[in-house]
Amino acid sequence: MSSECARSDVHNVLTSDSMKFNHCFIISIIIISFFTTTKSVRVLLKQNLLPTCTRNLLFSAIINGIIHQCVTAVIRLRAFYHAIVYASDPCAILFQSSQCFFDGNLYYYTNLFSSFCCFSLFLDRLFSFKPRSSYHNHQTLASIVLILSQIVLPIGPLYWVFYDAFYTSYVLMCTYPPPMSVMKLHEVNNIRICVLIVLLFFAIFLYIHNKIREKRMVHNVYNINSRYKSYENYLATKSVCIVIFSQILCVGPTSSITSVFIRFRDSIPLEWFHLIISYLTGLTYSNFLLPLIILYQDKQIAKKRRIMIQRLQNKNETSFDHFDTLKSLWGKKTGNQETLF
């Protein structure tokens, strides 16, 4: 039990039906995401149509998403439990920050990991820019290096955010950072969103370039393997653009709205403030969308690849028919010449 009692308005927010519905809504999103994630993993394992490094990075994003969803579910269940058990005890309903040390740090670590994963996906597409680059022959090594970078890099920003935090304060639930870390955390989030937007801009440039190059190869290159690799590169870049955009779409507004709410907190009713903040769990929605994107893109890539292969086969069949016709005509011509002389 905490030694700090919640104010009556805070206690009313935490025990309100609206907040309980919010917990149920977030947990429902998480449960659905587990089912779609299972399907997306099967697709990547059995029906993979992406380059090796891209696939491995998507696996790392999925695993991180599962961990984040589990942590979020535990945090929400604990908050829901407090709202029911301590509904009449405002002095026990809050969480001391020390009680949230493990959950909170893992929650924010997986949050940053997802953005570094987007950065790795972009680097993978950037290094694949040249079709004949040696990078294509070292996909497994590249994925190991990039995944290790994703694991290590979030530690730096998180250390800066939390190194001077006091864990004796109290929070409404474990998604709330200690008060000393709030502004620094929002600075990190704002920088993260800006970096993701820049990555999306350059990823779109790569996508457009790969699309133009693929169309040119249709008319200038007749090597099936080269055209196949070019088409695969174009489709993989498109998938990465969608993944980065989905994270910006989910994380960007939640970070921006939270910053605005904190700045104008005094002019916003407390109940609305905490209720809306509780819905702004951007990465939960991003993790919900990621497996859906993988499933959708897999179907699109498989469909377009079948069309592409069929076109190549039709062209080859047409070429063979053309040469067979020429051979037949040549045979007739030489036969006629033999009869004439």
Swiss-Prot record:
| Gene Ontology BP terms | sensory perception of chemical stimulus
Q: Which GO terms describe its molecular function?
A: G protein-coupled receptor activity
What does the UniProt keyword field contain?
Answer: Membrane, Transmembrane, Transmembrane helix
Q: Where is it predominantly found?
A: membrane
Which Pfam families does UniProt cross-reference here?
A: 7TM_GPCR_Sra (PF02117)
Membrane disposition: Multi-pass membrane protein
The protein's location, in the record's own words, is: Membrane
Q: Where are the transmembrane segments?
A: 25-45, 57-77, 107-129, 142-162, 188-208, 242-262, 275-295
Q: Which domain of life is it from?
A: Eukaryota
Keyword Transmembrane among record annotations: yes
GO CC, sorted alphabetically, is: membrane
Family listed: Belongs to the nematode receptor-like protein sra family.
What name goes with this protein? Serpentine receptor class alpha-28
Q: Which organism is it from?
A: Caenorhabditis elegans
